[in-house]
Regions:
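C-terminal regulatory/oligomerization modules of transcriptional regulators
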Residues: 1-7, 131-157
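N-terminal leader segment of winged-helix/HTH proteins
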Residues: 1-37, 84
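Pre-recognition alpha-helix immediately N-terminal to the DNA-recognition helix
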Residues: 18, 45-49, 109
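Alpha-helical linker/hinge and terminal dimerization helices associated
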Residues: 19-22, 26, 67, 110-126, ...
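N-terminal helix-turn-helix DNA-binding core of bacterial DNA-binding proteins
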Residues: 24, 28-70
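Residues within helix-turn-helix
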Residues: 60-61, 72, 79, 99
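Alpha-helical DNA-recognition elements
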Residues: 76, 80, 143
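Charged, amphipathic alpha-helical coiled-coil/dimerization segments
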Residues: 79-138
């Protein structure tokens, strides 16, 4: 008898393992640029996330949620990045409890350095050396997120 569906625990362990490995590999790829900028890969991920939203201020809470860091930790990291000149922090005029963050010119330059680094890596690969459609990966991850949302909804969480 053939197995129709993957076992939940096998699925769970596979996903956790892949997420950890992907995160670790991204950190490795960011490490060189982070070292050059005298920041951590996590701080560089924050800069990249802010760069994707560079037209507007982002609340510290939203930023933390986007990269999976809790409020107190994200706030401290933002303070350090501000001291180093990568971001500006501004209290919201609508709600003074909310602190918004935006990249400075130095922060934008740091994000551009990451982009340059990845473009160089891409150029160094032989033509056809990597046959990956990034949009397909993103679409499949969105489908997984949607599936998990349905499970959460059914469970009443």
């Amino acid at each position: 008898m053939t197995k129709k569906h993957i076992d939940f625990f096998e699925f769970n362990n596979s996903i956790f393992s892949m997420i950890r490995e992907i995160s670790h590999k991204i950190d490795l790829l960011l490490q060189e640029t982070a070292n050059e900028l005298d920041i951590t890969p996590l701080q560089l991920k924050m800069i990249i996330t802010l760069y994707a939203n560079r037209e507007k201020y982002v609340s510290i809470g939203s930023l933390g949620k986007a990269i999976g860091i809790t409020g107190g930790n994200i706030s401290n990291i933002c303070k350090r990045l501000e001291k180093q000149g990568f971001v500006n922090r501004v209290r919201s005029e609508e709600d003074e409890r909310v602190v918004n963050v935006r990249l400075t010119d130095k922060g934008n330059e740091a994000a551009c350095r990451v982009d340059d680094y990845f473009q160089k890596l891409k150029e160094d690969l032989p033509e056809g050396g990597v046959d990956v459609n990034v949009q397909t990966i993103i679409d499949e991850l969105c489908a997984l997120e949607s599936l998990l949302d349905k499970y959460i909804s059914r469970s009443g969480l």
